């Protein structure tokens, strides 16, 4: 159910942004609003508090965001509150931002390495991904995990390329085990 709510509201915001030709502006505003929600857990507690009326919640959110973000984004937040969907707000924002990336043909890559990767290597990885995928740009996320021993693991969406030494050793071990049994 939660994913359906996120999709429904995220699509509505995306369509509104396209219709008003304000996709870039709304994208930046949603990123900023999302950051406010992520950094202020008290705001989430306030919105989820059962004894605070929807009207009080709407007034509070309007007080925070009106004049700081567009009327479209403020109005969207008000609708979410009036419909009682504030507990889905993070999922709605994530869906909207994913939809924007899809529209702009921007991929998101998660790269795991055993050691820190230099800036030059990061550029080479990004260039290789751009050359071998349909994306025109990438949001790159790097993580160091010494347990993979060496190589890289690259995840883009639901696709994973695992060229880690750990994976290769596991495969070799399985193959040797099969030979011993055969």
UniProtKB/Swiss-Prot annotation:
PANTHER family: ATP SYNTHASE DELTA CHAIN. GO terms for molecular function: proton-transporting ATP synthase activity, rotational mechanism. GO terms for cellular component: plasma membrane; proton-transporting ATP synthase complex. F(1)F(0) ATP synthase produces ATP from ADP in the presence of a proton or sodium gradient. F-type ATPases consist of two structural domains, F(1) containing the extramembraneous catalytic core and F(0) containing the membrane proton channel, linked together by a central stalk and a peripheral stalk. During catalysis, ATP synthesis in the catalytic domain of F(1) is coupled via a rotary mechanism of the central stalk subunits to proton translocation. This protein is part of the stalk that links CF(0) to CF(1). It either transmits conformational changes from CF(0) to CF(1) or is implicated in proton conduction. It is found in: Cell membrane. Keywords: ATP synthesis, Cell membrane, CF(1), Hydrogen ion transport, Ion transport, Membrane, Transport. This is ATP synthase subunit delta. Belongs to the ATPase delta chain family. Its main location: membrane. It is a peripheral membrane protein. F-type ATPases have 2 components, F(1) - the catalytic core - and F(0) - the membrane proton channel. F(1) has five subunits: alpha(3), beta(3), gamma(1), delta(1), epsilon(1). F(0) has three main subunits: a(1), b(2) and c(10-14). The alpha and beta chains form an alternating ring which encloses part of the gamma chain. F(1) is attached to F(0) by a central stalk formed by the gamma and epsilon chains, while a peripheral stalk is formed by the delta and b chains. HAMAP family: ATP_synth_delta_bact. InterPro entries: ATP_synth_OSCP/delta_N_sf, ATPase_OSCP/dsu. It comes from the Bacteria.
